[in-house]
């Protein structure tokens, strides 16, 4: 499974109305391809979102709060992309960051990218099941229309230098 998108409270309708369905799917597929097995995910994510025109702004569109450096990973036509691939537990902070932008009128919906990798010892079920329960439990604090994209990026692949190709 490369990635899975879960839509909550009609976020898919907002994305459809903004004619961003294909754009979002191709962006998430590109992020998945670029980050799978990588070590430096933060920089690669910024580069991928920049190449897909999610970071192209001159008017502070990425900013969450005026006068602060808090920024989304990307924004396009009122849809923000936020995420963290280190820990699934970023779901709470990520949803909060999106909700602040929504409440301030900066965005209409958001996509939260998370890792689907969690401890095999977890008794809480799959990341998909947990995301559904947590978004429901966070209502009414998190009340916006939001989508969650779960990625299985695998562990970093570190080359030992014996592969064919290169110089």
Description of each model-found segment:
Residues 117-167:
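Domain-level recognition of nuclease-like catalytic cores that cleave nucleotide substrates
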Residues 80-84:
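Short catalytic-loop micro-motif centered on adjacent basic/acidic residues
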Residues 106-116:
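Conserved beta-strand signature within the Rossmann-like core of class I S-adenosyl-L-methionine
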């Amino acid at each position: 499974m490369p990635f899975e998108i879960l839509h909550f409270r009609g976020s898919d309708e907002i994305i459809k109305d903004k004619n961003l369905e294909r754009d979002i799917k191709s962006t998430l597929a590109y992020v998945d391809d670029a980050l799978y097995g990588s070590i430096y995910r933060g920089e690669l994510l910024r580069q991928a979102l920049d190449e897909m025109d999610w970071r192209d702004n001159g008017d502070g569109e990425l900013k969450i709060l005026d006068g602060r450096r808090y920024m989304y990973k990307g924004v396009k036509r009122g849809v923000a992309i936020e995420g963290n691939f280190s820990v699934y537990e970023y779901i709470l902070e990520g949803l909060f960051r999106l909700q602040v932008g929504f409440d301030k009128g900066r965005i209409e919906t958001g996509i939260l990218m998370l890792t689907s990798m969690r401890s095999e010892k977890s008794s809480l079920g799959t990341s998909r099941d947990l995301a559904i329960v947590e978004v429901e439990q966070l209502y009414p604090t998190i009340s916006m229309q939001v989508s969650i994209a779960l990625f299985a990026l695998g562990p970093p692949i570190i080359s030992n230098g014996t592969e064919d190709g290169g110089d």
